[in-house]
Amino acid sequence: MATADLILKNGKIFSVKDDNTIIRGEAVIIKDGKIDNICGNDEALKYEGNNTEVIDCGGNTILPGLCDAHCHPSIAAAVYAGCDLFGIYIQENETPDEVIDKYLARLKDFVDSHPDNALIRGTGWVQGNFITDRKPARQDLDRICSDRPVILESFCQHSLWVNTKALEIAGIDKDTPDVYAGEIVRDEQGNPTGYFKEPEAMDLIKMNVPGYDFSVEEYKDAFLFYQSEFANKYGVTLVQDCMHSDNAREAYVQLAKEGKLTVRARGVYMLEPGAFGEQLPQFINRKGSDDVGKDFRIDTIKIFAEGMFVLKEPFTEEFISENGMPKGYRGTPYWNDEDLGKSIEDSMKAGFDVHIHAMGD
């Protein structure tokens, strides 16, 4: 019997066979970087040699790996190469102005240290800090940077906060029509405030400010950072990026082909209301063309059934009334029932899984 390179003993071991049968044991035998056996502690003694490393798991549970079925690793590009607004400590009693000042202080540090960036991008601010009439506005960002476009995405990717320069470059003003699935927040005169809610409104900025998206190389560097600093450290072995750009998708493909992924990744094709009749046949024809073995694959259609509500308090009838919404308000559906049902049915017939963003009724 060959000796093991590594033995994990005295654990509660759970694994799965190819036929989905659960395997239980007390020890894991590892040889040449692969699991050779899962067995009891007594049997594990047979695999010990002079050069075998033995780790006592102390009765802890050992799993083969965690799968994060809804995450956004590509956001790492905005953290890695942009202004990181995550991790700013906000106290419960702080006013919106005090919160904004904290965000602006972090932004100023980034702007001052990146004088050559033609575009300032970032992510991580939280809409739930602004449930009063005071909302993030372009004038706030103008105080820090007015000569370059500033585009800050919220932590959840459902809102944008931009400065006046970004609005000018995108050609957005009071005459810009409202969108159905989202909101261009406006002041009393109808001028855009620089606050955009939900993807359809956000795309007015993203699609019209040159250089908004990160490059393929920036995404590759960012995912390698995410992979080593987060996924590998916390036992995540598979991630599904549930909203990503074409550049991010290409970054995954290249990393997989280069053999640099230690985390399996899955992407999505985004199906939009009103356009699914043209989009879905394209996705069906493309299915499999982006796949790289088991390391990267796109076999999921993503649908936004509605938007997102970020609050510090429950979504009650009292809250609805206080915020001027009609009694019984349940949000705004992005799809009619017939189109939504057909898009799901046709996607599944084509062999796709369907991933639906839905937070309400």
Range-by-range predicted roles:
Residues 255-259, 286-293:
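Acidic (Asp/Glu)-rich catalytic clusters
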Residues 3-9, 14, 20-282, 299, ...:
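Divalent metal-binding segments
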